[in-house]
Amino acid sequence: MAKQPIFKKLVLLDKETEDLYRMADDLSEEELHDQSYGWSIIQVYSHLNMAESGSIRYMTKKMQAGDKLGQFTSFGRFRYMLTKGLLQSSLRWKAPKVVSQPKGDFSLKEMREEWAKTREATKQYVEAYPEHLLNRAVYKHPFAGRLDLAGAIGSFIYHQRHHMHQIKRIRKKIGR
């Protein structure tokens, strides 16, 4: 099945989301919402959820173009690999202008529930995605440019890894 590598990425995405949540297991709600050092940990989770849900909404809309979608190119693959390397690093940079201030008023339980709904929508999107469009550039990443579905799901993984560094910094600053 041509989507098998994408399903494997979804399993990895789930595992790494759980890793992110484990980083909050020993924190109080007060610590999770502490904005003394920029975004709180809950805001980081909210940002990741908003990025994933917004991406799925965007791709759902773009997929309506069907065969008119452009091909995922070699240059696109190159830009994706560069972006992947940057996202896996601990380097910091300003978020793209399309990123809004994430909500920080969720409890950890509410955040998990919201993100679980988003993840379920992501899985349903992948399951319903037509195999004949797998090589099409259905997603526009703010840095990498146009990506295919596998690249989009991969970018969710690397985006989470990037913010894992941020959560580690926040934990260190609050003395954890």
Residue positions per predicted region:
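Extreme N-terminal tail/first-helix region
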Residues: 1-18
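Short, contiguous alpha-helical
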Residues: 31-85, 128, 132-176
